[in-house]
Design a protein with these regions (language model features):
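Soluble catalytic domains of enzymes that build or remodel membrane lipids, polysaccharides, and related
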Residues: 220-510
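Membrane-embedded alpha-helical bundles of multi-pass enzymes
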Residues: 2-221, 437, 451, 463-465, ...
Length: 536
């Protein structure tokens, strides 16, 4: 059959099919904002996580039967609206930067629509596998390409849905994203095949079976959490305004405030006290007077103290680091960790010769930090006490933990590497004051929830302006700094018992193997489409 005649017949079939579609599918212009709206509402501060399970249905309906370029455009528009509603807080740092980030991130929605528009039209069960696999593959690429930005993943919308997210200890956050997208795909295919009850039964049955298995595993895991020794940790939330943070005129005030809050925290008799990222208002190890004051605070309370500070290494070319320093209970420095994963255009300018113009548009100077080189596991000793569940625990117990600075907790491979190096719990110190009183701190904490579940370790967060909290192995926020009902932009302390676990999960050992499988499926599907079109 000539190509022209075949195209005419295909167009006629699409028109006939459109007339028999449900009204919701025929009225496609309203579907794009509907998808974006549902997805935005599933994230903080709304936390209507159940909307994520239907959030992509309108988009899939909208791109069904569309040409590839049309599917790309509609999906890209959905992505623009979604990211405008989720990373809007970047406007507090830079408006041009926020627009650029939104336009870039939306590309992943566009590519998703471009690829799955043909899968969405299939009548075979392959669509139920391909659609979520393509989404997961794109999320993984987004989390790694150009240093990565794994923020607002589909899985993160489920951070408060504890039974569902337990599968992350095997498949990571990407496994949860796959499950949510699979349900979206099944609902879409059900709507599309509403007149064919055989397909209706198959798609929904398959999706519900996946959900049932995940829930069953989640309930089992929630009832069988790993036990271990207890450690009491205290976090300090200084609530230091950005306008004061690096002004030398306020240095004494800032150090004095942290000293008072640390003394307050010590009344809870913790084994470790934690300050936020860059809480020390200067170069701790290079300024003798400042070092003496902070060391004196640690010595006075008699408790190991972890502080965030900029560090500088003198040499032929001075190197600046974003660091975490651990003081022993005697005021002596035990170890230092230098941040491994820097924030591009925040802590450094990548390919500075090409992108030096970016600094002209930044509302504050862009840092020139260097990347750390070591996966540091902090170690300190504590005496055995009545809270130990281990009768064989010696009088001195070595406690091991690692620290993720700022956005490092959005990188699961980094957290898993620390746990593989025998960290018994993780700490995230951060300063989210840059983003104002927005949903950013809550979105940020969602990443820490998944790091806890993936590795079955407790995660302790100390944030300058919040959210400072404790997350257990189940991903539940068990305690937080809160004053007068507010957890953001207040100062305060919180102390809580955490569990030290030595368990290695499947995810800790094997990492993103599930995501790799999804990428293979997605790549095979794309290659199949290209080959098929080439032959035809």
């Amino acid at each position: 059959m000539p190509v022209r005649e075949r195209k005419k017949i295909q167009k006629m079939l699409r028109q006939i099919n459109a007339r028999h579609q449900p009204p919701a599918i025929r009225h496609k212009p309203i579907l794009i904002p509907a998808s974006a709206f549902f997805l935005i509402l599933s994230f903080p501060n709304f936390n209507l996580w159940f909307l994520a399970w239907i959030g992509f249905v309108p988009l899939l309906c909208a791109i069904d039967g569309k040409k590839p370029i049309e599917a790309f455009a509609l999906s890209y528009l959905t992505g623009v609206l979604f990211f405008l509603g989720t990373v809007y807080w970047l406007v507090h740092v830079t408006l041009p930067g926020m627009i650029a980030v939104v336009l870039y991130l939306a590309l992943y929605f566009g590519i998703f629509g471009l690829v799955v528009s043909s899968a969405a039209g299939r009548k075979s069960p392959v669509a139920l596998l391909v659609i979520p696999a393509v989404w997961v593959a794109l999320e993984w690429v987004r989390a790694h390409l150009f240093t990565g930005f794994g923020w607002a993943l589909l899985a993160h919308s489920q951070s408060y849905n504890l039974p569902i997210i337990q599968i992350a200890d095997m498949a990571g956050a990407y496994g949860v994203s796959f499950l949510v997208m699979a349900v979206n795909a099944a609902i879409f295919m059900t709507i599309r095949q509403i007149r064919n009850k055989n397909y209706y039964t198959y798609y929904m049955a398959a999706a519900l079976f996946l959900v049932f298995l995940s829930l069953a595993y989640g309930v089992f895991r929630l009832k069988n959490i790993f036990a271990g020794d207890m450690l009491k940790v205290a976090v300090v939330q200084g609530n230091i305004p950005q306008t004061k943070k690096w002004d030398r005129n306020y240095r004494a005030e800032i150090v004095g405030k942290y000293a008072a809050l640390t003394l307050e925290a010590s009344k809870e008799k913790p084994d470790l006290i934690i300050w936020p990222e860059t809480s020390v208002p200067g170069f701790l190890e290079s300024e003798r007077d400042l070092f003496g004051k902070v060391a004196g605070i640690s010595k006075s309370v008699g408790v190991p103290l972890l502080v965030g500070t900029p560090s500088i290494a003198r040499g032929e070319k001075d190197s600046l680091y974003n660091s975490a320093v651990l003081f022993g209970d005697g005021g002596r420095v035990l170890e230092r960790y230098d941040k491994l994963h820097l924030v591009p255009f925040g802590e450094y300018v990548p390919l500075k010769e090409l992108f030096s113009f970016v600094e002209k548009f930044a509302p504050m100077p862009i840092g020139d930090f260097s990347r750390g080189t070591a996966y540091t596991v902090f170690k300190f000793f504590i005496e055995r006490d009545s809270r130990s569940k281990d009768a064989n625990w010696h009088m001195l117990k070595k406690v091991r933990f690692s620290c993720l600075i700022c956005f490092e907790d959005i990188f699961p491979e980094l957290a898993s590497e620390f746990v593989r190096k025998d960290a018994l719990f993780l700490v995230n110190i951060t300063n989210d004051a840059w983003f104002g009183n927005t949903s950013a701190p809550y979105q940020h904490a969602q990443s820490s929830v998944f790091r806890a579940v993936e590795n079955r370790v407790n995660v302790v967060r100390a944030a300058n302006t919040g959210l400072s909290c404790f997350i257990d192995q189940k991903g539940m926020i068990t305690a937080k700094v809160c004053r007068a009902g507010k957890d953001l932009f207040v100062d305060g302390v919180a102390a809580h018992d955490i569990v030290l676990t030595k368990t290695r999960t499947f995810y800790t050992v094997y990492g993103d193997i599930f995501a790799y499988c999804c990428m293979v499926i997605a790549l095979a599907y794309v290659v199949g489409i290209i080959v098929k079109r080439g032959v035809s």
